[in-house]
């Protein structure tokens, strides 16, 4: 019987163990999509205590605490960091079977070195003091943790109107060897249905020094900001798409009318929203191809389901879930609009509903080519799927319907500096899956064949994919 979280955690056979310990575990981390605050890296934030670094902004933990009956004051309210931390300690023993239990103990092990101690109300004070002592040292600042965890690149998520001043500060500091690069998140520019769309057009116009009145004005403003992002090292865009919209692109004159009506406060029809969204996203995708960027499409979240809590706390507070709208037709046509002129950029497709895994794994095969290995990717298990079953399902379906060997692997998608252990979690699951294939005779039990593939999935593929500007 294995002990909990031993060195061979999640590794069920000898081949898996060798793949992990000899090939996977020492690979650097290329965290190409996250939600870290670049200001905290630029300023090298020193966290005051474990509660602060562990619970600030982590809606995974917040959802678990609510389910365990913790009152909101102890989650997002005005309670002290210590009281929130103790509420989390009360919650963790109730999370058995949930990845939160694994993640919590992995995060204590790395970087804090706490092993053989289960986190609970009984051990919480001891762990609090031990971790707080470490957090007061230079090795446990925001930058120190990234370096300890062997991170070589972190791709943040940034609005086109952002100044990117913090990325500039980081890039100019020769004492810090981790690349922190912006990623372009233009959702507010193509979601014309948003209540604050007109306000956003004004802000975008101010930053770009262009008054946005016509569709061409919008594209000119976006183009100026694309150049700004590119100059600051941006190599990826990310579109958060709750509903995949597609409609044939109307004339520019018609798009001018749609934009003018919306800026005047009119509510557009679903078809008109789809026309505008398609026009902007197709134009953006073609520009990404010209710049050599990667386009990421995160599809299928159903957001802000609780009106009461949205009004109280705003977005990204733990009240989102998996959507179930079909979107294969719209997605295929959206990608095809770019591909028809051979201007589809390298693209990663993520789905939140695992029902869509096989569809997505076959969709990517429609648009491969151009001599680029894995040009269109089926992204790693995202959000509610970045747990053992979800990640394994995604990789198995990719391997059966595409090429696992070209997969760009894991990303944290997190706001926390302690989330890098999710790369370890992913690597163990990957090695166990490939190891089982080998032990069952489904693939050759040849580490000279399997080892390099695992190394590429853990690091090499992502580095090549994001750094080759083609």
UniProtKB/Swiss-Prot annotation:
InterPro entries: Metal_Hydrolase, Uronate_isomerase. Gene3D superfamilies: Metal-dependent hydrolases (3.20.20.140), uronate isomerase, domain 2, chain A (1.10.2020.10). Keywords: Isomerase. Pathway: Carbohydrate metabolism; pentose and glucuronate interconversion. It catalyses: D-glucuronate = D-fructuronate; aldehydo-D-galacturonate = keto-D-tagaturonate. The keyword Transmembrane does not apply. Its EC number is 5.3.1.12. One of its GO terms (biological process) is D-glucuronate catabolic process. One of its GO terms (molecular function) is glucuronate isomerase activity. Belongs to the metallo-dependent hydrolases superfamily. Uronate isomerase family. This is Uronate isomerase. The gene is uxaC.
């Amino acid at each position: 019987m294995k002990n909990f979280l031993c060195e061979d955690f999640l590794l069920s056979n000898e081949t898996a163990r060798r793949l992990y310990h000899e090939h996977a575990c020492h690979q650097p981390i290329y965290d190409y999509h996250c939600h870290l605050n670049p200001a905290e890296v630029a300023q090298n934030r020193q966290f005051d205590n474990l509660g602060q670094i562990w619970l600030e902004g982590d809606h995974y933990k917040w959802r678990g605490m609510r389910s365990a009956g913790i009152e909101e004051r102890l989650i997002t309210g005005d309670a002290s960091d210590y009281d929130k931390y103790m509420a989390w300690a009360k919650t963790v023993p109730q999370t058995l079977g949930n990845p939160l239990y694994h993640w919590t103990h992995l995060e204590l092990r790395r970087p804090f070195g706490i092993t053989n101690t289960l986190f609970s109300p009984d051990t919480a004070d001891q762990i609090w003091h031990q971790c707080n002592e470490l957090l007061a040292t230079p090795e446990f600042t925001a930058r120190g943790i990234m370096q300890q965890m062997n991170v070589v690149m972190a791709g943040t998520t940034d609005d086109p109107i952002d100044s990117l001043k913090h990325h500039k500060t980081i890039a100019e500091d020769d004492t810090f060897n981790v690349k922190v690069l912006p990623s372009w998140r233009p959702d507010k520019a193509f979601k014309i249905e948003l209540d604050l769309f007109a306000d956003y057009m004004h802000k975008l116009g101010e930053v770009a020094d262009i008054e946005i009145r016509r569709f061409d004005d919008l594209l000119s403003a976006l183009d100026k900001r694309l150049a700004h992002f590119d100059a600051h090292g941006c190599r990826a865009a990310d579109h958060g798409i709750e509903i995949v919209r597609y409609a044939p692109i109307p004339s520019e004159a018609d798009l001018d009318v749609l934009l003018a009506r919306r800026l005047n406060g009119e509510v557009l029809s679903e078809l008109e929203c789809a026309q505008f969204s398609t026009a902007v996203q197709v134009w953006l995708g073609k520009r990404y191809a010209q710049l050599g960027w990667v386009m990421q499409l995160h599809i299928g979240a159903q957001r802000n389901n609780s009106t009461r809590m949205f009004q109280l706390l705003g977005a990204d507070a733990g009240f989102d879930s998996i959507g179930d709208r079909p979107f294969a037709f719209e997605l295929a046509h959206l990608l095809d609009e770019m591909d028809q002129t051979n201007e589809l950029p390298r693209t990663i497709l993520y789905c939140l509903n695992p029902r869509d895994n096989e569809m997505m794994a076959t969709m990517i095969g429609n648009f491969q080519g151009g001599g680029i290995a894995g040009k269109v990717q089926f992204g790693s298990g995202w959000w509610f799927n970045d747990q053992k079953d979800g990640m394994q399902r995604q990789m198995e379906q990719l391997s059966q319907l595409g090429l696992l060997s070209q997969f760009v692997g894991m990303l944290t998608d997190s706001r926390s500096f302690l989330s890098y252990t999710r790369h370890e979690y992913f690597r163990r699951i990957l090695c166990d899956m490939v190891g089982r294939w080998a032990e069952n005779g489904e693939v050759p039990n040849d580490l000279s064949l399997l080892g390099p593939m695992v190394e590429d999935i853990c690091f090499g593929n992502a580095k090549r994919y994001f750094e080759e500007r083609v």
